[in-house]
Curated annotation (Swiss-Prot):
Catalytic site positions: D231 (proton donor), H255
Function, in words: Specific in hydrolyzing the terminal glycosidic bond of polygalacturonic acid and oligogalacturonates.
Name by which UniProt lists this protein: Probable exopolygalacturonase C
Family to which this protein belongs: Belongs to the glycosyl hydrolase 28 family.
Signal peptide: 1-21
Cellular component terms per the entry's GO annotation: extracellular region
InterPro entries: Glyco_hydro_28, Pectin_lyas_fold, Pectin_lyase_fold/virulence
Catalytic reaction annotation: [(1->4)-alpha-D-galacturonosyl](n) + H2O = alpha-D-galacturonate + [(1->4)-alpha-D-galacturonosyl](n-1)
Keyword Disulfide bond set for record: yes
E.C. number(s) listed in UniProt: 3.2.1.67
Glycosylated residues in this chain: N84, N151, N219, N271, N313, N434
């Protein structure tokens, strides 16, 4: 159960642990403990421990501690669903293993069980092992990525790893190795996530849709974590307010720190305020800071800051599109091309590092042109900033400052800017036109 990726090992070694607890401590003591037995060793890794796990969550659903034993392996061959939890700590000191039989997992997903772990209730804490060798969820996603058909971005019947809906809770030392696809859908209020690791690095096929945390809620922070994956490290969805993403390292073929996508369904009004992404290192990613909404969407995203972002070999360090496209998606209803999810009070401050000039893009491209190049005129891959506003009134109070991003080719950094008018964006920091980036 060792991490073998050299880059990931180096980053883990460089992190300084900063413990964060839950915002509010439970009122009642967790007086009951359920220690989950394992048949992994006695069966030489063939037995299914899912029934024992499900039994523990049923017996200790309230005011309890549920323990996966230290250094012990568990086969979780069937989904675990515990939606009646209250004031429970899930203590993951061992290692969990999903099935390696792709067809068996697909059949489970086809039956309607699309998420492998579902936890719901107030004050549900996840505490992983301090020892880096333990506390891992092993999903064996490499075989799925390698089996993905050529020129396809969507292998059928892939499970989501985890749905976690709680309040006044903490998630510490969450560790996911080779997730099949999406990692954690995190919903709720007053949640701290710290010291998480997502390792979706691949030795073969591209790890499509291996999002780190898809977030929806209020007062949520994700800090001191490492995510190497093939999609968003964090994607903030609506409705969300007061979200912090800080002191993290993200990369591999990451799609960065994202808001959205928003507005795909024009009847779903976007409502997002007060987001802060700060002190983040981004390595070998497609994007660093990204906003994505569909033309025809509706709603408002306000008061967003990306600050002190370090990029190494990133294709699009700062990227905004209000005309997002998805190569595998269709849209409901009638679309008004002049309607937009409005953006207001956005700041990009103190970005430094390199732009991927020589080998831009990533392995998610299955179309020609690549989905991430659609609508971008005369790309040079020297672009420090791309701002695609849908209309002349859909972007307001944009500010850039301290942008020190340099193409690997040593050419001057450039910018693509559409419809971010000087009247609505007096502190934009450069002239909104396509060409060389000249900060004011």
């Amino acid at each position: 159960m060792l991490i073998t990726n050299p880059a990931l090992l180096g980053i883990l070694a460089s992190l300084v642990p900063l413990a964060l607890g839950a915002p509010n401590q439970p009122i009642q003591a967790r007086s009951r403990k359920c220690v989950i037995p394992s048949s992994y060793a006695s069966s030489h890794g063939t037995a299914d421990d899912s029934p024992a796990v499900a039994s523990a969550f049923a017996q200790c659903a309230e005011n309890s501690v549920i323990v996966f034993q230290e250094g012990v392996d568990y086969n979780i061959f069937h989904p675990i669903k515990a939606t009646n939890l209250s004031n429970v700590e899930i203590r993951v000191l061992g290692n969990l293993h999903l099935p390696q039989d792709i067809t068996a997992v697909q059949n489970i997903v086809k039956s309607g069980q699309s998420t492998w772990f579902t936890f719901q209730g107030p004050r549900v804490d996840w505490t992983g092992a301090d020892d880096i060798k333990n506390g891992w969820i092993n999903s064996y996603g490499q075989a799925w990525w390698d089996a993905n058909p050529a020129n396809s971005s969507s292998f059928p019947n892939r499970p989501h790893l985890m749905s976690y809906k709680t309040s006044q809770a903490s998630i510490k030392n969450f560790r996911s190795r080779k997730p099949i696809a999406w990692n954690v859908k995190l919903q709720g209020d007053d949640i701290t996530v710290s010291h998480a690791i997502v390792d979706a690095t691949s030795t073969g096929g591209f790890p499509f849709n291996t999002d780190g945390f898809d977030v929806e809620g209020t007062n949520i922070s994700i800090t001191d974590s490492v995510m190497f994956n093939g999609d968003d490290a964090i994607a903030v969805n609506t409705p969300s307010h007061n979200i912090v993403f800080a002191r993290n390292t993200i990369g591999y073929q990451s799609h960065g720190m994202s808001i959205g996508s928003l507005g795909k369904d024009p009847t779903d009004f976007a409502n997002i305020t007060n987001l802060r992404f700060e002190d983040v290192t981004v390595i070998d990613a497609l994007y660093a800071a990204r906003f994505k909404s569909w033309s025809g969407g509706r709603g408002l995203v306000k008061n967003v800051v990306w600050k002190n972002i370090r990029t190494f070999n990133v294709t699009f360090p700062i990227f905004v599109t209000q005309s997002y496209s998805d190569q595998s998606a269709s849209r409901p209803g009638t679309i008004d091309p002049f309607s937009s999810v409005m953006m207001e009070d956005f700041t990009w401050s103190d970005f430094s590092g390199t732009i991927n000039t020589y080998h831009p893009g990533d392995g998610s491209c299955v179309t020609d042109p690549c989905w991430y190049n659609v609508g971008l005129p005369n790309l040079k891959h020297t672009e420090a900033i791309v701002l695609e506003c849908n209309t002349e009134s859909s972007c307001k109070n944009f500010r850039t400052e301290g942008i020190r991003l340099h193409p690997q080719s040593k050419d001057s950094p450039s910018v693509i800017c559409m419809k971010a008018t000087a009247e609505l964006n007096p502190k934009l920091g450069f002239e909104c036109k396509n060409g060389t980036f000249v900060p004011h």
